[in-house]
Amino acid sequence: VNGQVNKIVRFILLGSLLLSAGAAQKQSTRGQPAANDAYKLVAVKVKGTSRYTDQEILAASGLQIGQPAGDGDFKEAVRRLGDSGMFSEVLYSYTASGTGVKIELQLADTADTKLVPARFENFVWFSDSELLKELQTRVPLFKQLLPLSGNLLDRVSEALQALLTEKHLPGRVDFLREEDESADTLSALVYRLEEVSIRIQGVEFPGASPDLTPLLTVAARRLIGAEYTRSALAAAVKFDLLPVYLRRGYLKAAFAPSDARVLPAATTGEQGPADIEVDAIVPVTPGKVYSTSSVNWKGISAITAIELAPLLHMPPGQPADEVRLHQDLENVTKLYRSRGYMTAQVKSEAQFDDEKSTVHYDLNVAEGDLYKMGELEITGLDTQAKARLEAAWTLHQGQPYDADYPKKFQEDTGSLLPRGIRWAVTVHESLDAKDKTVDVEIHFKQQ
């Protein structure tokens, strides 16, 4: 009409098609131009995504405003978006006229539950913000989250390798899948450098007070000379550094993710080009010191508060030592197990008063059922030695079980074993939740 030709083509890519670039594509043929028709791309409109801007989608698609674009280009753009794994659905339509072609993309974002965060282990020359900026320029769909399927993780890996090459930096980029052991699910995708040695020369603690810095330095001593990885530093924070604060009442102390400062290369010739030394930087926000105001037991009946009191070391008015509290509660659990309460659990619940800088603890005890001694089985010994040990076992069937007894039994009966032989002893306790009994197997093995 009036010398103008309007043509509309639709293309749909559903979630199942994302799994295979070669999957069949559904396409309508209404008014479809010839496959080699090309028009100047004059506009791109994006709908349906809350994760990306129009500019990011355009960059990821490979299309360019002002350049010729035809049916094959649009199919390739859809393939690029679909193969990334960041969309569960891609639909597009375009209108071609004498002035050019306008394309509309209708997208459905992949659910957040199907994405995991990306982490960077040892890219010591870059901060997280610098890496993110570089990657978003090179991989427009990357925003610190990666899909469980699709090729986006490979695109990120390639971009990181290209960045290293451009900067003349050593290392080969690899990635691994990190699992959450408690949930048996993928928790992160971790990018790291291989074929390069990055060693920790020193550790700094920005934010730490002068009186605690020496204690942190001692706690971090095993890191000196170790390979620099953020996961190793995170483990050191959890098990070595944070307890320095928790022992002294800094109950809200927090460590930020570690960074690194690359040190000047050695000039002695002893280092190769792929040997890097760094100072690890572990920022800390100590917070305030909390003193214990009071402690309250809840859920106890089998053991009295008077019996439990000697096991607890949280004096009112003194800085709350959560490391000691954890140890104390483990001892409380052991006491319950020695009385036959084999499934007893004790959990602390802290209630903070920030104005007074105090903390109250509720110690919640789930005692569980009383278990009694079941059957005893001794294996690995000759008949006579087995008979001697069975006679020495005084925890009889039907009596409340004592989880401390097997260890004491081993200590007291060593003289009953055949002489001249070193024995490895393993004790296995089997709980019968229905009958509330504990069967004990003691196995002896010659070393």
Model-derived regions: residue spans:
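Periplasmic polypeptide-binding modules associated with outer-membrane biogenesis and secretion
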Residues: 25-447
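Bacterial N-terminal signal peptides
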Residues: 10-20
